[in-house]
Amino acid sequence: MKKKVPAYNGTLRDHTIMCPYCISECSGIRIFGKRIKSIAFSTDVAIIKNINADAIIAVYPFTPQAAISQSIISISDVPVFVGVGGGLTGGKRSVRLALQAEHQGAYGVVVNAPIADEVITEIKQVVDIPVIATIASVHTDVRRKLEAGADILNVS
């Protein structure tokens, strides 16, 4: 028997972007005790405040900046996974950004597809949040990303 969940939408927030209901049937993933079934891919704070996703993945095609991560984390009512580079930005800078993101309250950090496996390993040595490795090609050696320390894969 399907559960009937009481709901309140209000008048002013009745235009929320709703994730498809079928997502509620998924098992999801549990991170730090919180089950996450839906993840919205956005850096738009208006979208982030008005979507019913369980989490946000915030990556963008510019050099990652702590101020941007902090803004998104502070505006969000749900866990945020923030980008820490891996393309033009990499190496020690990505490691420092990952540590700073953890201190800001990020639930995890996302590394871009071209990141060196050694940088994933370095990030894992300094943070206690998941490292999410972006996979953008069927030619990516997924096993090496996982062996380097990636906890979750973002296939895009």
What residue ranges belong to the model's regions?
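Alpha/beta enzyme core
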Residues: 1-156
